[in-house]
Every structure is written in C-alpha cells, then in structure tokens.
C-alpha cells in the first residue's frame, strides 16, 4: 500500500457514487433523446455523443477503479491497466472534441461568418466522426508503443505515463503532442468561439436584428454550451496542470495523493454534462416528465 489502507475506502466510495449517478443520468439522456422525435435535432446528436463518452468512462473506467480501490492497488495486470486507461482517455477525449464541435457550431450559427448556414444532420455526423477520430489519436498510441498506460497516484487507476522517461516508449514526445493537440488547441478554439459569440449576442441585442424569441432561444443554447465548457475546464484543468508539472519535474518526489486528487476530480466530468443538458433544456425536462 502506498498510503494507509483505510484511505482506499474514499476513492472506492467516490467511484461508487459516480457510477450510481453517472450511469442512470447518461443512459436516461440517451433514452429520452432517442425516444422523442422532437429532440432528435442535429445539435442534440453532439450532446448524445457526450452521453456516450460519459458511459465509456463509467462502464470502462469507473467500475475498474472502484474494484481496484477495494484491493488497495491495481490488481488487474497490464491488460486491465491498458483497458482502463484507454476507456478513461477515450471518454474524456470524445467529450473534449464534442465540446469543440459545439463551440464551432455556436460560433457559425450565432456569429454568421458563413451567410445562410444551417447546422444539418450531415454536419452533425461529420462532427461526431471528427470527435471520435481525434479521441482515438490520443487513446490508441499508448496501446501500440508511443507512451504507455501505467497505474497513477494511489495505483487504483491508470493513465498516460507522465512520470518516467522509460526507454523505447518516447513518453516525452507523446506528452508534448498530447498537450499541444489535445489540450491547447481545443482550449484556444473554445476561447475564440465563445469570445466572438459573446460579442455577437450583445451586438444583436443592441441592434434588435432578430426577434426576441429567436434571440432568447439562441441565448439559452449558447448558455448551456458555455456551462459545459466551463465545467469541463474546472474538472480537467487541475489534472492537466498537475500532469504537466510532474512531466516537467521528473525525478522529483511526489506523494501518491498529489496526482490522485485531480485525477479523481476529473472523473466527475461524466456527471455534469447530462445534468447541465437536462437542467438547462426545458424540452428535455418536459419529455422526461
């Protein structure tokens, strides 16, 4: 045990709570949206993709982490570590790139850089495919030798190897690639899109270019998507910051809890997306009732 054996009860209980809430909420989001035709809009396809990503994390990652927490170390071997790390990374990355697609959609629809553009089903499908391709370019390489998945923190869950310069895995190049392509670029895109979005909403309100009903509907959707992006950053920014700090200070000593806390905090992202979707979308609430 890396810490007091009693301490493993906390992550185990936390994972149980995330599974208890995350599975039914995300499954309900999928079921209600697919069941009601009026909810099957192109924009909601991307939101459904978020629910699928969260279910990957819940079923492929959280269940494994809860089981290993009960034993006090990662008992499932190399294959189990690869599977847990892959599903957790894949789910987080699908969610990240889905939010990128949503940000671009909001920017194009509200700011109108392309005149007479409509976000159609074909655009949504392209967005889904894009999010999956980008997610796989991050989750697959550690399985085939570019970096690797290893137990992290208290050794109850697995993640990308930020910690070592193990020969033959090229960890340094993969971590730099991951931070640039899968963190800084999406982050910059979202800041740009929402910066332009806020300006456009204010300008439209001042000029009264559209009807009050249209403006209100666009504001509600934009507010929901912004909330999702902010919540995503709140969950994943601490993990990314700590991981980068460890990567830049390899060889220094870090306590197991130092990486465990932000890693487990990041896992809560599987809950907030469907809750925001449900709480801020009156059509979804009405269909559930």
Curated annotation (Swiss-Prot):
Glycosylation sites: 171
Amino-acid biosynthesis found in the keyword field: no
Disulfide bridge partners, by residue number: 81-158
Cytoplasmic side: 33-44, 105-123, 196-223, 280-289
Sequence intervals crossing the membrane: 8-32, 45-67, 82-104, 124-144, 174-195, 224-245, 258-279
Main location group: membrane
PTM text: Phosphorylated on some or all of the serine and threonine residues present in the C-terminal region. Contains one covalently linked retinal chromophore.
Motif ('Ionic lock' involved in activated form stabilization) on chain: 105-107
Keyword annotations from UniProtKB, A to Z: Cell projection, Chromophore, Disulfide bond, G-protein coupled receptor, Glycoprotein, Lipoprotein, Membrane, Palmitate, Phosphoprotein, Photoreceptor protein, Receptor, Retinal protein, Sensory transduction, Transducer, Transmembrane, Transmembrane helix, Vision
Subcellular location: Membrane; Cell projection, Cilium, Photoreceptor outer segment
Gene Ontology terms: biological process: absorption of visible light; G protein-coupled opsin signaling pathway; visual perception
Pfam families: 7tm_1 (PF00001)
Site, as annotated: Plays an important role in the conformation switch to the active conformation: 84
Alphabetized GO MF terms: 11-cis retinal binding; G protein-coupled photoreceptor activity
Residues recorded with modification N6-(retinylidene)lysine: 267
Ranges in the topological domain labelled Extracellular: 1-7, 68-81, 145-173, 246-257
Matching InterPro entries: GPCR_opsins (IPR050125), GPCR_Rhodpsn (IPR000276), GPCR_Rhodpsn_7TM (IPR017452), Opsin (IPR001760), Retinal_BS (IPR027430), Rhodopsin (IPR000732)
Topology versus the membrane: Multi-pass membrane protein
Entry GO CC: membrane; photoreceptor disc membrane; plasma membrane
Assigned protein family: Belongs to the G-protein coupled receptor 1 family. Opsin subfamily.
The protein's role, per its UniProt record: Photoreceptor required for image-forming vision at low light intensity. While most salt water fish species use retinal as chromophore, most freshwater fish use 3-dehydroretinal, or a mixture of retinal and 3-dehydroretinal. Light-induced isomerization of 11-cis to all-trans retinal triggers a conformational change that activates signaling via G-proteins. Subsequent receptor phosphorylation mediates displacement of the bound G-protein alpha subunit by arrestin and terminates signaling.
Protein name: Rhodopsin
């Amino acid at each position: 045990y890396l810490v007091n054996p009693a301490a493993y009860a906390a992550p185990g209980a936390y994972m149980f709570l995330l599974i208890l809430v995350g599975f039914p909420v995300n499954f309900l989001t999928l079921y209600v949206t697919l069941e009601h035709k009026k909810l099957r809009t192109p924009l909601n396809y991307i939101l459904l993709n978020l629910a699928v990503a969260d279910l990957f994390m819940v079923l492929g990652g959280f269940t494994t982490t809860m089981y290993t927490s009960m034993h006090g170390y990662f008992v499932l071997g190399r294959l189990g570590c690869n599977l847990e790390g892959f599903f957790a990374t894949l789910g987080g990355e699908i969610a990240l790139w889905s939010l990128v697609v949503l940000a671009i959609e909001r920017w194009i629809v509200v700011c109108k850089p392309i005149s007479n553009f409509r976000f159609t089903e074909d655009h949504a499908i392209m967005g889904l495919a894009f999010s999956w391709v980008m997610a796989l370019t991050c989750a697959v390489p550690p399985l085939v030798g570019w970096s690797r998945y290893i137990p992290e923190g208290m050794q109850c869950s697995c993640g990308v190897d930020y910690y070592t310069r193990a020969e033959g895995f090229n960890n340094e190049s993969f971590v730099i690639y991951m931070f640039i392509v899968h963190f800084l670029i999406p982050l910059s895109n979202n800041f740009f899109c929402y910066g332009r979005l806020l300006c456009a909403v204010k300008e439209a309100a001042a000029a009264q270019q559209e009807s009050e009903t249209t403006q209100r509907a666009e504001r509600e959707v934009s507010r929901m998507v912004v909330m999702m992006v902010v919540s995503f950053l709140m969950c994943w920014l601490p993990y990314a910051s700590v991981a980068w700090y460890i990567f830049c200070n390899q060889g220094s000593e870090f306590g197991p809890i130092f990486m465990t806390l932000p890693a487990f905090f990041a896992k809560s992202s599987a809950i907030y997306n469907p809750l925001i979707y449900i709480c801020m979308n009156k059509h979804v609430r009405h269909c559930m009732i």
